[in-house]
């Protein structure tokens, strides 16, 4: 078996190293004789350990089990009490503990004072400013590090250096923690007042971040960066990350481009050997030096020196070190401020009347015109989505908080909950549901707030608006997004593009007569100056649209939307400050509306257009591209002459002066070669991504289980690794062991094996080999997958009770009746299931399901139930295919230049051989004709799973399905009778399989699966006309070839001789594939 089980066994010996500790391995096998031996072996182990006898003899006697069966889990007994961590820590606590400088941060509570100084009493205490919000503890993290250190103390050569670097850093952490004692966590992994009162308030979150950093140290540079960040982040909890990452916005403008990739007309990346010189005016260097000065003032030494040294050559070869610093800066942890400070931050800006009204007018008009442009087609044609906007809103209502807790009755059960979906049901049951009235958010009913914490920036507040706002905005925003989807300017929404496409767009026009202007407008989005012109622009647009239709329902939709904007122009928020709730008039735009992303993009586009129209009075240029992406916008400007330092200087100053005339506090920069925005940065013609996902601290607590969080941890590790920040894999695996272990009693714990955690079942957490998704096809793998499928979905009494109540049933019936024109069980059941699934965000239900899940799991990990599930998974399909393939060696030359320097070598190699892809493969069925037909007449959006089910029904059933959703009979008949229907069968199957194989996640999203170079390694003689079978054979072959190359750095070619007789069997099977949800797929989804 793999490395994981080996480490697991070593880890258990490390943790439970006393006389009383016992490890009992549990094996299973799909072979019934061997399975009986496994059972005997297990019971004898239990027997022996109860009588205090050694297990060694049994290991010899049952060697056949150990050799041939598969490890299922390890049961560990230990009567050891808790102080193990403290004892082990002393060995490493040989250094000088850190002393926090208590004057570094502006806000008193951001200084790392002793907790009782910040919070004199337990009543005042809150952990919300330092809560790691992750279901693992500091003691576990310390154990994981000490385990690694002990395991590697005898390393030699280069590995010894890594050991020494990490040991040195851990000494700092250990000594500091040891001075105060290891804070003990409670059952919910929180740190309470009596634990923290005599310790520095930020000790835990700092230690977690430091451990994450030190376990990511490999080179000497890593060591220097980590040491500096660990030491300084102990005191500076507010500005460190910002200080360290600020220079990047200028660094990208300093590197010459010598060959780059550009987007061609086919939207593919194509190499261009152009040379573009970085033209940098002196003022830019002055600004950079100012930044480096600020870093030194904050006590940084090595990091500014590295940047200074790099500035000598400004080479792209050494640039990855700059990228590394930029990524590392985020790993100091989240900045979590008090809500009051977060809210006041936006209101502190001086409001001046001294602004350029003319520019504001232009800005407002551009917003107005864009809103009209986005919506005029659907409004003129009385689009059904705008007519049935309320129903569409209800169908996609979230189960997030509605801002207040209410007592709700479901049948005999009384519950109190804050969830939007439950409030809607309750209001309908009690005749309180009035979507036609948008509740005010003024001083009488101020808006409750949520928060968004992010490293290196201030905490931002989020409006938690009543559900009426969501219903009023949903349909209109969906229409805006559809427009944005085919408008290149909206980089974030543009049709199935990914970031590589946007990269090629920027480099496309760079030359010696162009410059690129890039602006971070996040300050502007939340400024008071923005709110009036912004909302007024939208309102004016809606007024114009209202004159384009006579349909009462469309008018009502537009009117309600307008009302949300009017209400929000007079908004108050409520902020708890100690025991009082403060009401503050809040005159700025905050996220929390459905329109946040779309409307911000519109506004930011309007903003950059306004600025460009102003500076075009002074300079003559052609605007080659304008893009907006979230909080950032950028534009490439082409001049008639070659760009000079003076020109850049002038344009730069004019742009800044122009923003200043609108009193917009934004950071605007001009360069000839690169840009830096929140999502990505381009330097030297190459693309970089910030690898800044925190592993051991989380932004907030949700209702995910420890297993979910272990999968998320692994997923975060993978994303960071693809972006150039690598954490030691053994450490990550150790964390997974800790987080997936299940306590049976105080002294008894069960640790699942690698097989359990990596087989794609409902319990999958990680991949045995990074970047490679394996679908087990051996007997034992399929056996365990089947066993897990037997206990997949857990019931919840509370959920069943709610679902049985009339309140719930009537709600579902009401939705079905409004949606359907005739009976349609598939849709009705689908709605009921979706609504029931939304109940999972109600804590008591998720807790109940979790308990059931764990008890089922416990049974399973001790002895797998023999259960012959008749369900077919993707594994079964691949298992049928596998035997017909023969492998031979092959060779592919490297033929593409590198353009993403931070990628791991094995992934980079594949892109260099077969090329990259700039699009997302469609995996939701939305491009199929049936999906388009439905959306033409109905607001209902079937999932890919549902489409997959429907498209394989009999033709008359498909007709009935369509007619019940309001599709005219003639259209339904035409559809079923046409070629399009058979194309759809294939297309939907294709989407479904892509979806099951996670083709848009991990590193697979980077590879060009249609590469001719890849195709030529695969030979499948064409037999019979079953395109679906040909498709799955090709896809399987491609994945096999790519996985082999990732693992071995060399290529194979595959030949498949698939018998005709088997094809039809396989085709039939392909219509019954069950999809599996697991913590792993859930974590992929969580990455977006």
UniProtKB/Swiss-Prot annotation:
Cofactor (UniProt): Mg(2+)
Location relative to the cell: Virion
EC numbers, comma separated: 2.7.7.48
UniProt enzyme class: transferase
Catalytic reaction(s) noted: RNA(n) + a ribonucleoside 5'-triphosphate = RNA(n+1) + diphosphate
Domain RdRp catalytic: 501-687
Record keywords, A-Z: Magnesium, Nucleotide-binding, Nucleotidyltransferase, RNA-binding, RNA-directed RNA polymerase, Transferase, Viral RNA replication, Virion
GO molecular function: nucleotide binding; RNA binding; RNA-directed RNA polymerase activity
Main location: virion
PROSITE patterns per the UniProt record, alphabetical: RDRP_DSRNA_REO (PS50523)
Gene Ontology cellular component annotations, sorted alphabetically: virion component
Swiss-Prot/TrEMBL GO biological process terms: DNA-templated transcription; viral genome replication
InterPro entries associated with the record: DNA/RNA_pol_sf, RNA-dir_pol_4-hel_dom, RNA-dir_pol_luteovirus, RNA-dir_pol_reovirus, Rotavirus_VP1_C
Subunit and partners: Interacts with VP3 (Potential). Interacts with VP2; this interaction activates VP1. Interacts with NSP5; this interaction is probably necessary for the formation of functional virus factories. Interacts with NSP2; this interaction is weak.
Annotated function: RNA-directed RNA polymerase that is involved in both transcription and genome replication. Together with VP3 capping enzyme, forms an enzyme complex positioned near the channels situated at each of the five-fold vertices of the core. Following infection, the outermost layer of the virus is lost, leaving a double-layered particle (DLP) made up of the core and VP6 shell. VP1 then catalyzes the transcription of fully conservative plus-strand genomic RNAs that are extruded through the DLP's channels into the cytoplasm where they function as mRNAs for translation of viral proteins.
Family: Belongs to the reoviridae RNA-directed RNA polymerase family.
Protein name per its UniProtKB record: RNA-directed RNA polymerase
Organism of provenance: Rotavirus A (isolate RVA/Monkey/South Africa/SA11-H96/1958/G3P5B[2])
Lineage of producing organism: Viruses, Riboviria, Orthornavirae, Duplornaviricota, Resentoviricetes
């Amino acid at each position: 078996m793999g490395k994981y089980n080996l480490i697991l066994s070593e880890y258990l010996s490390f943790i439970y190293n006393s006389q009383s500790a016992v490890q009992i391995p549990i094996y299973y096998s799909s072979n019934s004789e061997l399975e009986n031996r496994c059972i005997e072996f297990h019971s004898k182990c239990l027997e022996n350990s109860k009588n205090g006898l050694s297990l060694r003899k049994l290991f010899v006697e049952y060697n056949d089990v150990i050799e041939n069966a598969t490890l299922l889990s390890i049961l560990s007994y230990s009567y050891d009490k808790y102080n193990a961590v403290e004892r082990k820590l002393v060995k490493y606590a040989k250094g000088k503990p850190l002393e926090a400088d208590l004057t570094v941060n502006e806000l008193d509570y951001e200084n790392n004072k002793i907790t009782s100084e910040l919070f004199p009493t337990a009543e005042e205490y809150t952990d919300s400013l330092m809560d790691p919000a992750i279901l693992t503890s500091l003691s576990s993290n310390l154990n994981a590090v000490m385990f690694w250190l002990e395991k590697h103390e005898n390393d030699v050569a280069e590995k010894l250096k890594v050991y020494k670097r990490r040991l040195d850093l851990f000494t700092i952490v250990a000594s500091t923690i040891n001075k105060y004692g290891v804070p003990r966590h409670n059952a919910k992994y929180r740190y309470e007042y009596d634990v923290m009162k005599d310790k520095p308030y930020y000790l835990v979150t700092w230690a977690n971040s430091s451990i994450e950093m030190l376990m990511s140290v490999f080179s000497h540079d890593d060591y220097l960066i980590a040491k500096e960040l660990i030491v300084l982040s102990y005191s500076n909890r507010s500005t460190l990350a910002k200080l360290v990452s600020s220079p990047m916005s200028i660094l990208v403008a300093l590197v010459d481009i010598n060959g780059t990739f550009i987007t061609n007309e086919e939207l593919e990346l194509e190499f261009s050997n152009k040379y573009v010189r970085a033209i940098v005016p002196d003022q830019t260097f002055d600004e950079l030096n100012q930044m480096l000065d600020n870093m030194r003032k904050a006590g940084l030494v090595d990091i500014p020196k590295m940047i200074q040294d790099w500035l000598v050559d400004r080479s792209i070869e050494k640039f990855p070190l700059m990228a590394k610093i930029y990524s590392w800066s985020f790993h100091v942890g989240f900045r979590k401020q008090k809500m009051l400070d977060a809210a006041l931050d936006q209101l502190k800006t001086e409001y001046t009347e001294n602004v350029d009204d003319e520019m504001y007018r232009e800005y407002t008009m551009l917003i107005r015109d864009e809103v009209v442009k986005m919506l005029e087609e659907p409004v003129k044609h009385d689009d059904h989505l705008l007519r049935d906007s309320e129903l569409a809103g209800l169908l996609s209502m979230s189960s997030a908080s509605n801002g207040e807790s209410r007592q709700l009755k479901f049948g005999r059960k009384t519950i109190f909950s804050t969830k939007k979906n439950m409030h809607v049901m309750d209001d309908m049951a009690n005749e309180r549901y009035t979507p036609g009235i948008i509740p005010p958010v003024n001083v009488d009913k101020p808006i409750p707030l949520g928060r968004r914490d992010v490293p290196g920036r201030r905490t931002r507040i989020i409006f938690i608006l009543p559900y009426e706002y969501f219903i009023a905005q949903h349909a209109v925003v969906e229409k805006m997004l559809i427009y944005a989807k085919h408008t290149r300017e909206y980089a974030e929404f543009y049709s199935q593009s990914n970031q590589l496409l946007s990269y090629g767009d920027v480099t496309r026009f760079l030359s010696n007569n162009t410059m690129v202007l890039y602006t971070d407008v996040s300050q502007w989005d939340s400024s008071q100056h923005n709110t009036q012109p912004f909302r007024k622009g939208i309102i004016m647009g809606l007024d114009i649209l209202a004159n384009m239709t006579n349909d009462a329902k469309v008018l009502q939709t537009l009117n309600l939307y307008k009302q949300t904007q009017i209400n929000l122009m007079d908004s108050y928020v409520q902020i708890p400050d100690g025991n009082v709730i403060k009401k503050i008039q809040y005159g700025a735009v905050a996220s929390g509306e459905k329109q946040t992303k779309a409307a911000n993009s519109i506004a930011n586009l309007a903003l950059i257009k306004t600025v460009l129209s102003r500076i075009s009075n002074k300079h003559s240029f052609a605007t080659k591209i304008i893009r907006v992406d979230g909080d950032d916008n950028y534009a490439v400007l082409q001049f008639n002459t070659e760009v000079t330092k003076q020109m850049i200087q002038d344009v730069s100053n004019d742009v800044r002066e122009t923003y200043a005339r609108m009193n917009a506090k934004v950071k605007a920069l001009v360069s000839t070669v690169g840009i830096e925005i929140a999502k990505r940065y381009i330097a030297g013609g190459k693309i970089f991504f910030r690898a800044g996902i925190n592993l051991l601290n989380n932004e907030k607590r949700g209702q995910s289980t420890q297993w979910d969080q272990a999968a998320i941890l692994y997923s975060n590790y993978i994303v960071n690794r693809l972006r150039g920040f690598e954490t030691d894999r053994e450490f990550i695996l150790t964390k997974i062991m800790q987080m997936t272990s299940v306590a049976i009693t105080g002294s008894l714990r069960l640790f699942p094996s690698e097989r359990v955690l990596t087989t794609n079942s409902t319990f999958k957490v990680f991949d045995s080999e990074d970047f490679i998704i394996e679908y087990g096809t051996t007997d034992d793998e399929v056996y365990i997958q089947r066993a897990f499928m037997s206990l997949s979905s857990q019931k919840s009494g509370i959920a069943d009770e709610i679902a049985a109540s009339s309140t719930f049933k009537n709600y579902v019936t009401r939705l079905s009746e409004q949606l359907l024109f005739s009976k349609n069980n598939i849709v009705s059941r689908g709605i009921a299931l979706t609504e029931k699934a939304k109940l999972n965000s109600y804590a008591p239900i998720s807790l109940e399901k979790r308990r059931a899940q764990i008890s089922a799991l416990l049974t399973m990990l001790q002895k797998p139930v023999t259960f012959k599930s008749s369900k077919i998974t993707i594994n079964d399909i691949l298992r049928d295919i596998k035997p017909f393939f023969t492998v031979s060696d092959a060779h592919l030359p490297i033929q593409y230049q590198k353009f993403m320097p931070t990628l791991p070598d094995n992934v980079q190699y594949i892109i260099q051989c077969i090329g990259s892809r700039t699009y997302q493969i469609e995996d939701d069925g939305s491009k199929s004709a049936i999906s388009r037909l439905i959306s033409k007449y109905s607001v209902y959006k079937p999932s890919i799973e549902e489409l997959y089910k429907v498209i394989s029904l009999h033709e008359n059933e498909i007709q009935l399905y369509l007619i019940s959703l309001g599709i005219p009979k003639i259209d339904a008949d035409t559809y079923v009778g046409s070629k399009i229907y058979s194309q759809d069968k294939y297309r939907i199957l294709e989407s479904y399989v892509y979806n099951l194989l996670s083709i848009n996640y991990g590193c697979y999203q980077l590879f060009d699966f249609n590469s001719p170079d890849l195709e030529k390694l695969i030979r499948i003689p064409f037999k019979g006309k079953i395109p679906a079978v040909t498709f799955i054979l090709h896809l399987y072959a491609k994945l096999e070839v790519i996985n082999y190359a990732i693992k071995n750095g060399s290529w194979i070619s595959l030949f498949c001789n698939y018998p005709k007789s088997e094809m039809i069997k396989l085709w039939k099977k392909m219509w019954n594939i069950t999809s599996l949800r697991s913590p792993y797929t859930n974590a992929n989804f969580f990455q977006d």
